[in-house]
Amino acid sequence: MSSMRKKGMNKTTIKNYAIWARNELIERVTRKAFEYEVKKDIKSDDNMDVINGKVLTEDERKQRKGLIKAVDDKGFDQVIEEVAYTWFNRFIALRFMEVNNYLPKRVRIFTNENNEFKPQILDEAMNIGLEGLSKEDIYNLLQSNNRQELYKQLLIATCNDMGNYLPGMFTRIGYKELLFPDNLLNNDSVVARLISDIEEDSFNVQKEGQIE
């Protein structure tokens, strides 16, 4: 297969994935907003301490207030679109850095060394040392076998850590953390599809563009 034809196939695959991922992220981000009683065309009470029986942490209360203010300023749809776009861009950036061994911690975020969707970061969670995520928190999540929540916290902490290296791309998350999509370890998640749908070589700066 010629490199030109392969590139054309890659572009089509990437485009199809991007369209699907955008819609999927918008749906999941919207669902998270609803969980925190932030909905379109409905005035939200920004002083709630308990939602659906769940007591909000101090960080959650601050983030929720920030989210409500953003919705008041920009509109619900615009905020949801921006958050979905933010997470999409960060997943793509992290995957690019993972494939090219650019990650500062030298630990793969989405895959193992065989490019299987078995995130190395889960195995190295106790050793990676990410600001904002204590070993006690990690240990408790490991003990409760809550891998989905552990992975979520590791990804959020990684994005915040990357702000020390690429502050323009990885700004502090703020209220976007509330709207982080759930269940990213599922085989049909945006992250899983990123690995399965788009060839690793598409992100490899050394291999991409080589003539076959």
Regions found by a protein language model. Name each.
Residues 2-212:
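Preference for the N-terminal adenyl/adenosyl cofactor-binding alpha/beta module
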